[in-house]
Each structure stands twice: as structure tokens, then as C-alpha cells.
């Protein structure tokens, strides 16, 4: 499926992508800032995620939480999210409310700092700390998305530290520290604005120019730290985590080609073969046939610099021990390395991926988000239209070359969750001893 895309850039550097679709009377506004946890420096982590909250706390012309109220009162939905390489904000509104959504996004880009106060900062720091307690510390397996990057990336690497950041860093951050982070990264020349859905192109252009045009470009942002890594870990990395969980779960990561590279598509297809839907290798073998797992999946982080990671995620059945689960997953990965994949497996995986892409592009919100993603990470929103071609070009030989290069035992990082038990000796220690013997 190809979608119409028109793109242009304002004098202040803001890249704008438009995709008209009058199927339904709704329009999506999607703004990606090219800043994520990777842009934070040690001692000042957690700022990108903090701003996911701060940008909803009012600007010079909008009261705290009024952004939510105005959009919802107009019949729309909105949210924001943070990742290692980007932060994004998005609204989907009735077509006649496009001006409102654009004005709100422009106002907080250009007029947030006059309304930023110490009280708001203190309040949102507490909100983030509570979010961490709820979604990470007290959530079963909730620490995986911190611990796996910590295991898979060296401590000097920008992808190593926690996405939500250090609570100590947030507590010690001054208002000036936070304001300077905003001045550096939340600027039009470090952002992509995508609009998709039911709108008139010329009207949208005029609104974008009117609301975003006067915002000055930034002074530039510092370069990321060293990103390049060897293609493999060089060994099997392993960490056992004792947690308040009922069932063991294994996350296994492999260093993988970066998002958008030619080799990435073979890695993505391999992930689909391993863990996409119930017809995948891991699900068929571990869940249906051997019945050692309750669920299995695989996915890439879609990182565009240095190294991506392909992740396998398998949860045990109640009667399966952590050691049995780990052994079973290793056996399936080894079998893939030894036997390779068949062309029909590749074709099935590509069909599933293409179906997902087509379905996503029929949604105004997903369409806008994908244009923003390709524009931010790879420089061109129109790349969304060639993704199906890139996947269709993948053959079994491409996937088998990736498997041979990247899925061996010299390129595995294993994060194994085990149920917490009482006693002087931890479950993690006992498991280590059992496997070692």
C-alpha cells in the first residue's frame, strides 16, 4: 500500500509531512522530537521522559492539563511517549479541530518555558517516581526494559542507561538544568510534524506556517556519544533476576543491524519467523508441541544508530522450571542456526509483516506516526512507501546469512527472571549453582 505524501520544510527547520485521506472525518497530528534517553548525559538522566510529562503542564497561553481538556472536549484523543532515540506527542481529532491540535503543539514548542516553574518541576518529578514504582518496580518483569539494554550495551554507550532515568538524577536536577535541556532539543529544527487524515492541503500548510513559522530554530544540539559497536557480543552474556513473579521468563537479545539498513530487513523477517503470531517457530515448538512455554514472541528495538537488538521473549508454563525454559529456548535457537530457514517460512513472515503495515497505514494516527518515524530516524517520511518492497526483496539466503552471523552463542545476552523465594540463599544463586552443576 502506498500513501500520498507531501513534505516541506519551514525556514526554522521544521520538517512537515502531509498525507491526505478523506475516508473518515478525522485528522491526526503527530510531532516527533529527535531526542530520547540516548541524548542524556550521565548525572542528568531521565530528562527526555520527564518532558513527556512537563509538556502537558501548560505553556504561556495554556493552563496546566488544559491541553488534555481542550482536545478531549473537542472529541479527540492524545498522548505522548518516550524512547531511546525520540520523544513524540500526538492527537487525533475531528477534522474541523485541526487548527486546535496544531496551535496546542506549536504553543508548547514555542512558549513552554515562560510557564515552567519550580513547583511544576517538583510535582512532575514526584509523578515520574510514582510511575516508576507502579510500572517498573512493582510490575511483574517490569524491570526488563531497563536491565536488558544494560546487559546488551556497554556502560559507556548512550543506549545503556534506563529510559525512565535515575531517580537520584531527577531529584538533583535544577530548574535551569531542565530548562536548558528543553532549549537544546525541543526546537523546530529538531522536530518532525506529520498530519494525516481528512484535511485540505493548502489549509494545513497555512496553519502550520502561521503557528510554527515564528518559532526560532535552536542553537544546535551536542553530538551523541560513541555509538559504534562490534557486530557481536563476543560471548554469551547472562543475568538472573529474582523477582516477584509467578513464572520464569527469558529475554534473549542478539546484536542486530540498525533500523533501515539493508541487513535490518533480514533481521526483522527472522524475528517474525521466530516469534510473530502463533504460527511462528517458537510458539509452535515451545507452546504447542513441547508445552514448556505459555507464550513466545520476538521483536526488534528498531534503533537507528550503532546497533539494534533482536529480542526473544518466552514465558514458562507453571510446571516448567527456569532451567528447563532456558535450555528449551537455546535448543530452538541452535536448531535455527544449524538448519536455517526455508523460503516458505520467509514468505509467510513477509506476508504477516506486510499485512500489519497495510493495516497500520489505514489508521490516521498510525500513518502520521510512521511518517514521523522515517523522517526522524532516516531523514525522509516517503520511505514509508518502500517498506513493503524492502521486505519483499528478502530471501531465505538473506535470513540464513543473518542467522549464521548473529544468532550464534557468541552473540546472546540472556536475562532470566525467576520467582522470588525465601531463605538465606536467593533463588537466583540456587539456579546459578544448579545450572553450573
Residue ranges, per PLM feature:
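Short, polar/flexible loop-turn hinges at active-site or ligand-entry regions and domain interfaces
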Residues: 39, 57-61, 110-119
Amino acid at each position: 500500500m502506498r500513501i500520498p505524501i507531501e513534505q516541506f520544510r519551514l525556514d526554522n527547520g521544521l520538517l512537515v509531512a502531509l498525507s491526505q485521506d478523506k475516508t473518515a472525518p478525522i485528522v491526526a497530528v503527530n510531532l516527533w522530537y529527535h531526542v530520547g534517553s540516548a541524548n542524556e548525559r550521565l548525572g542528568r538522566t531521565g530528562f527526555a521522559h520527564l518532558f513527556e510529562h512537563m509538556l502537558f503542564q501548560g505553556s504561556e497561553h495554556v493552563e496546566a492539563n488544559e491541553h488534555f481538556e481542550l482536545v478531549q472536549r473537542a472529541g479527540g484523543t492524545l498522548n505522548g511517549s518516550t524512547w531511546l532515540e525520540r520523544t513524540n506527542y500526538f492527537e487525533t481529532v475531528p477534522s474541523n479541530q485541526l487548527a486546535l491540535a496544531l496551535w496546542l503543539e506549536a504553543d508548547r514548542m514555542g512558549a513552554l518555558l515562560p510557564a515552567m516553574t519550580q513547583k511544576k518541576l517538583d510535582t512532575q518529578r514526584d509523578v515520574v517516581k510514582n510511575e516508576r514504582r507502579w510500572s517498573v518496580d512493582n510490575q511483574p518483569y517490569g524491570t526488563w526494559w531497563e536491565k536488558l539494554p544494560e546487559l546488551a550495551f556497554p556502560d559507556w554507550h548512550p543506549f545503556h542507561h534506563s529510559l525512565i532515568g535515575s531517580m537520584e538524577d531527577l531529584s538533583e536536577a535544577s530548574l535551569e538544568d531542565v530548562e536548558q535541556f528543553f532549549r537544546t532539543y525541543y526546537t523546530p529544527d529538531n522536530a518532525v510534524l506529520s498530519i494525516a487524515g481528512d484535511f485540505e492541503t493548502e489549509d494545513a500548510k497555512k496553519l502550520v506556517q502561521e503557528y510554527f513559522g515564528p518559532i526560532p530554530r535552536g542553537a544546535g544540539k551536542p553530538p551523541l556519544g560513541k555509538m559504534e559497536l562490534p557486530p557481536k557480543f563476543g560471548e554469551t552474556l547472562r543475568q538472573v533476576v529474582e523477582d516477584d513473579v509467578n513464572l520464569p521468563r527469558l529475554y534473549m537479545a542478539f546484536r542486530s543491524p540498525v533500523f533501515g539498513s539493508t541487513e535490518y530487513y533480514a533481521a526483522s523477517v527472522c524475528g517474525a519467523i521466530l516469534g510473530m503470531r502463533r504460527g511462528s517457530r517458537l510458539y509452535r515448538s515451545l507452546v504447542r508441541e513441547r508445552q514448556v512455554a505459555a507464550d513466545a514472541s520476538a521483536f526488534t528495538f528498531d534503533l537507528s544508530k550503532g546497533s539494534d537488538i533482536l529480542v526473544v521473549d518466552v514465558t514458562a508454563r507453571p510446571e516448567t522450571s527456569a532451567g528447563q525454559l532456558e535450555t528449551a529456548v537455546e535448543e530452538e535457537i541452535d536448531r535455527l542456526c544449524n538448519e536455517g530457514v526455508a523460503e516458505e517460512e520467509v514468505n509467510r513472515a513477509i506476508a504477516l509483516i506486510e499485512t500489519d503495515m497495510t493495516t497500520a497505514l489505514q489508521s490516521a494516527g498510525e500513518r502520521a506516526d510512521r511518517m514521523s518515524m522515517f523522517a526522524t530516524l532516516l531523514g525522509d517520511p516517503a520511505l514509508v512507501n518502500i517498506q513493503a518492497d524492502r521486505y519483499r526483496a528478502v530471501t531465505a539466503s538473506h535470513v540464513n546469512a543473518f542467522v549464521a552471523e548473529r544468532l550464534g552463542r557468541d552473540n546472546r545476552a540472556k536475562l532470566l527472571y525467576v520467582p522470588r523465594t525465601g531463605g538465606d540463599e536467593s533463588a537466583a544463586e540456587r539456579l546459578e549453582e544448579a545450572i553450573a552443576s
